[in-house]
Amino acid sequence: MGEVIAVVGVGYVGLPLVVEFGKIFRTIGFDSSKYKIEKCRKGMDPSREISDIDMAMAIHSEYSDDPADLELADFVIIAVPTPVDEARIPDFRPLINASRTIGAHLKPGAVVIYESTVYPGATEEICIPELERAGGKVWQRDFFVGYSPERINPGDREHRLTNVIKVVAGDSPATLEKVAALYETIVEPGVHRCSSIKAAEACKVIENTQRDLNIALMNELAIIFDKIGIDTTEVLEAAGTKWNFLRFRPGLVGGHCIGVDPYYLTYKAEMVGYHPQVILAGRRINDGMGKYIAEHTVKQMIAAGSYIKGARVNVLGLTFKENCADLRNSKVVDIIQELRTYGVEVFVHDPEADPDEAMQEYGVRLLGWDDLPRADAIVAAVSHRKFNTLGAEDLSRKLVKGGCVIDVKSAFDPAVLNAAGLRVWRL
C-alpha cells in the first residue's frame, strides 16, 4: 500500500495513529492547535503518552495546521473529542467543524474514517451530510466513509493501539475491506468487522457504559457499607475469591470517555422514544461521588476536632485517572469545589498534571510536595505511581497532629496509618 494517511486531531487518540502509521506510510498529523503541531514537529508528544524514541521511529510522519494538506490523503482519520455540554447533551461542534474542514479538502475517492465516540447513527445522520455540503461532493460516489471506534486508554502501558483488536465498519463491503486492510498493517491481533457503521458506533458506547455502571454499583455499595460500618475494600477482596465476581472498585469517574459516553447513548434513546433508567441512575451516582467524598472529609475533620472554616486540606492528584496527565472532566475538581463551599482552604499537588493547564481549565494552582502546608486532612484522590512511595511518615509531615487521611482509591494500609496516629477513611 502506497497510500497517504491523514489524521485529524493529534491528541491522546490521534497521535498514536500518526506515529504507528508513520512507521509505514506517509502520514500527516493535522491539528488546528499550533502549539501541538510545533511540539510534534520537535518530536515530543504534548500529552507525554508517547516517548521521544517512539516519536522518532515514525520516519514517514509529518505535522501540519494547514487544511490544504488534507487533499493529499487517501485515508482521512478523524480523532477529535466528542464532549457533552453543561446540560449533558452531546456537543458535536468539534466533530462538525472537523467534518467541514475535511469536506472542503477531500481528495476524490478518499475514505474518511471516524474514530470519535458517537451515538449509533450519528456518523451517517450528522457527519456525512457535513462532508457533502462542505465540498459539494456526493457520498459513495466521490468519497467513502468508515468507522473504527478508538480504544485508547491514557496512562495504560499494557493495552496500546497496536495490541488491542480494532473494531471496523464501512459504508459498503468494499469500504469495509479497505478500512480493515489499513488497520491490519498496525494492529497485531487484527480487526473485528461489523456489518454496519451503526453497530460499530454502538459497540463503543456500550463498552464505556458497562464500565460506568459497574463502577456506579461499587460506589453505591460503598455508600451502603459506610452506613453499616463495613470496610468496602475488605468486602470486595472477600467477594473476589469467587471465580465469576467482577473486580471493579469504587471511585471517581471522569475523563473524556466513561463519564461522557453514556450520555450519548441515553440521548439517542430519548430520541427514539425510550427513557433509559439504569444508565442514568448510574450516572447520577457517579456524578455525585465528588460531593460525597468532600462531605465525608468534612465529617472526619469535625470528628478529629478541627474547625472547618479556615481548615486546610491537601489534595493529592488532579488528573481524571492515575498515571496520566489528562485533566479533562476530572471529578477531583468536584471535591475541591465542594470543600471550598465550607470555607476550607484547598492545596493541590499532582506530579503528572501540567500546572498551566490546571490553572487554565479549573483555576487550580498546583504546588510541589515540599510546598504543601501542614493540613487538617489529606485527600488521596488519584493513585499515581509516584505516590506509591509515600509512607505514614511522609503523610504525617503534611498533617497536623491527629490529622485525617481520606483514601479515595484505598492506596494505603489503614493499619499502618492508624499506628502512626492518623485518622483514616476510605471509600
Segments from the language model and where they lie:
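Structural/interface elements that position substrates and couple domains in central-metabolism enzymes
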Residues: 1-427
